[in-house]
Curated annotation (Swiss-Prot):
Role, per record: Catalyzes the removal of terminal sialic acid residues from viral and cellular glycoconjugates. Cleaves off the terminal sialic acids on the glycosylated HA during virus budding to facilitate virus release. Additionally helps virus spread through the circulation by further removing sialic acids from the cell surface. These cleavages prevent self-aggregation and ensure the efficient spread of the progeny virus from cell to cell. Otherwise, infection would be limited to one round of replication.
InterPro entries in alphabetical order: Glyco_hydro_34, Sialidase_Influenza_A/B, Sialidase_sf
GO biological process entries: carbohydrate metabolic process; viral budding from plasma membrane
Annotated organism of origin: Influenza A virus (strain A/New Jersey/8/1976 H1N1)
Region named Hypervariable stalk region: 36-90
GO cellular component, one term: membrane
Protein name, per record: Neuraminidase
Cross-referenced Pfam families: Neur (PF00064)
Subcellular location: Virion membrane; Host apical cell membrane
Amino acid sequence: MNTNQRIITIGTICLIVGIISLLLQIGNIILLWMSHSIQTGEKSHPKVCNQSVITYENNTWVNQTYVNISNTNIAAGQGVTPIILAGNSSLCPISGWAIYSKDNSIRIGSKGDIFVMREPFISCSHLECRTFFLTQGALLNDRHSNGTVKDRSPYRTLMSCPIGEAPSPYNSRFESVAWSASACHDGMGWLTIGISGPDNGAVAVLKYNGIITDTIKSWRNKILRTQESECVCINGSCFTIMTDGPSNGQASYKLFKMEKGKIIKSIELDAPNYHYEECSCYPDTGKVVCVCRDNWHASNRPWVSFDQNLDYQIGYICSGVFGDNPRSNDGKGNCGPVLSNGANGVKGFSFRYGNGVWIGRTKSISSRRGFEMIWDPNGWTETDSSFSMKQDIIALTDWSGYSGSFVQHPELTGMNCIRPCFWVELIRGQPKESTIWTSGSSISFCGVNSGTASWSWPDGADLPFTIDK
């Protein structure tokens, strides 16, 4: 075969290969068109998916940390029917507390992308429970985590994620710019309250379903602040309490009633010699009960109870089982402030049952270590220090921190009563440990009328991290 014949043969082969490739591409186009036509035809028949629920689940690995990006239920041809959370039921009768969630965020944060945060709290709608938290605009084990022991900065934001998940940029939802916050669901939408700005002129921004609906300007210009736990919704109205004034003396306290994020009523408490901060509030038979922190002068906790018209009663938990930290050793209680070792404090909670009270408190009387639940059958009204039950939550040797209440409504649980629950913040890092950062994880428990366990569920992270060395 001469040179010209070789060239002709090679050219012919190339031409044949090109034609075959072209035919294959045309075939692919035809198949894709047919597939699309079939799918389009199926979509024109809604009866195929009528009243069905299709679940899409996307997962990914980020820095070797498993993160569930979304788990969204889409009802074909249907929307989620809004309801109104009534809040008229009484608290469920309980005999103890069952562990509900633990996010292990500090342990996971040694390797994964986890927010530096504090002041976590939990709130539930009729469909889900979410963990809310105040970030520092930084991740664990990163240089921007340096100095995050500071409470108030322009970088702090309120965000939320599904309960029990470690809060990361991949599963968290932005809620508000805030260094003090609250949130709750009325059955139709999320209300968020985020306070930010300078100490002498902060502003609370109210959002309903993510849209700004109202604001509250600091009225004493001395660090306006709110609950750091969920607000309360009853029959379409939501309620919160705010403080403005000194943290170590008489301050000003206001109750607010809101509907769809708009303030419709507010009153200032007449409470001389009382100190209310960081109140943990819950609904009970159509009223709101708040148990708060006295940072001024008491070892026991103040409370305020009010109806939907903001008519209120005030007092201190009478029990000689004291709930604040630091505090005196248990002894003789008082239905006013117990002044011994009462300066400073920590956010906490209690649940009233008639004359009795479940008291959540640190095990240590002087530092934020350990946690326990105590049932005092007459502690709301009597001053002795006897109690009938104690359940261990965190060992004395392990760090705890803030704690607060949340509830699960009958519309979520299917029960005929409001289930009481609580969360505990497990603070790690500065100022007690050799790190450049301060952050926390959280655990939560819910009340049950069946078997429970006493144990310790600590944070468990091995410190310091690489960034700290």
